[in-house]
Amino acid sequence: MNLAELTEYTRHLGTRAKTASALMAKAPAASKSQALKALARRLRDNTPALQIDNARDLERARAAGLAAPMVERLQLSPQTLETCAQGCEQLAAMPDIIGAIQGLQQQPSGIRVGRMRVPIGVFCMVYESRPNVTIEAASLSIKSGNACILRGGSEAMASNQALTALVQQALAEAGLPQDAVQLVQTTDRAAVGQLIAMPECVDLIIPRGGKGLIERISREARVPVIKHLDGNCHIYVDAPCDIAMAVQVADNAKTHKYSPCNASESLLVARPVAAEFLPKIGAIYATKGVEMRACPEALAILGAVTGAKLLPATEQDWSEEYLAPIISVKVLDGVDAAIAHINRYSSHHTDAILTMHHAHAQRFLREVDSASVLVNASTRFADGFEYGLGAEIGISTDKLHARGPVGIEGLTSLKYVVLGEGEIRH
């Protein structure tokens, strides 16, 4: 496609999405639920065919020398597809918040003032690798009464095309416009530049991918952006704590999966429990091949662990998102130092405290400036499905509009409604 053809194509996508968004905004709740249930059924019925399409993407990715974490994110396993189907069903079962009026109060003038939940309109999702994002974005768009334009990575084109076809079939079955979910069918990066500069058609941009992609979109977009740049998540092991529980959680937070943005990248340990805790978690990390980049005090303790992969930590390690079997380790005085360290080096994504001290837990929840803060649970729970949102379209570390996992409410806004009986202002 030349530039003129690309401009015409993206404009056509935007115009069709805008038309579809008006229909979706007034779609009955039953129709949206029907579409989501139909999509769940189609995902299950077509799992073998979807895996064939996904295998083509995986083969091309490996041949192109894509990094292992990117290839891992690209995979559509039967479990991944089942999770997507369950997410659709969970969304279908949730109450429809569109059109609901909240906080209606009568004013001295006699008018009643409240706020109504309404769809954003059209959002454009720009993402890399993970084809399951196609279903997460589409299902949330349907439930929230929006239209969406999906621009997945070129490495996942076959998977995304197959998934989008199923979404459009489900929309048609429910009597909803197929243009409510459209996939950008070109891998030309200039298409992204055009979509993020179309405020007359696109109301919101949600990038989900590498830091370079998100920085570029944040810099060039002419419409609002919901984003997070990094996932430098922390586990802080407090004193006192249940050591066995802390070992289990710290293991899960790091090694359950290395590539997600909610995997723990930094392990902070209170000095009173370091000598007992670090050898135990160090042995597990050593067995699983996790490299530990540690402060001098932690290195001295971990040095006795057989097979431990140890390196001295640098200043950069405290703020690094590894997305790999690497973790930074630091021994601290206690909760004050942990909170200060997290607020300085964290990406404000997800951070957790493991403790038996109620006051420390409450301070951590109040004072750590992150989108999700957890007590005695793995950072891997920072996920829309796990939070009961049905699915998530991304995780926002911004402080305005949406923060944390973005589900249905994050794809809506509130407008004021005023009910009167002929009142006039004096």
Swiss-Prot record:
Its EC number is 1.2.1.41. It holds the Pfam family Aldedh. Keywords: Amino-acid biosynthesis, Cytoplasm, NADP, Oxidoreductase, Proline biosynthesis. It comes from the Bacteria. It is an enzyme of class 1 (oxidoreductase). It is found in: Cytoplasm. Gene3D superfamilies: Aldehyde Dehydrogenase, Chain A, domain 1, Aldehyde Dehydrogenase, Chain A, domain 2. Catalyzes the NADPH-dependent reduction of L-glutamate 5-phosphate into L-glutamate 5-semialdehyde and phosphate. The product spontaneously undergoes cyclization to form 1-pyrroline-5-carboxylate. It catalyses: L-glutamate 5-semialdehyde + phosphate + NADP(+) = L-glutamyl 5-phosphate + NADPH + H(+). The keyword Amino-acid biosynthesis applies. The keyword NADP applies. Pathway: Amino-acid biosynthesis; L-proline biosynthesis; L-glutamate 5-semialdehyde from L-glutamate: step 2/2. The gene is proA. One of its GO terms (molecular function) is NADP binding. Belongs to the gamma-glutamyl phosphate reductase family. InterPro entries: Ald_DH/histidinol_DH, Ald_DH_C, Ald_DH_N, Aldehyde_DH_dom, Glu-5-SA_DH, GPR_dom. One of its GO terms (biological process) is L-proline biosynthetic process. This is Gamma-glutamyl phosphate reductase. Its main location: cytoplasm. GO terms for cellular component: cytoplasm.
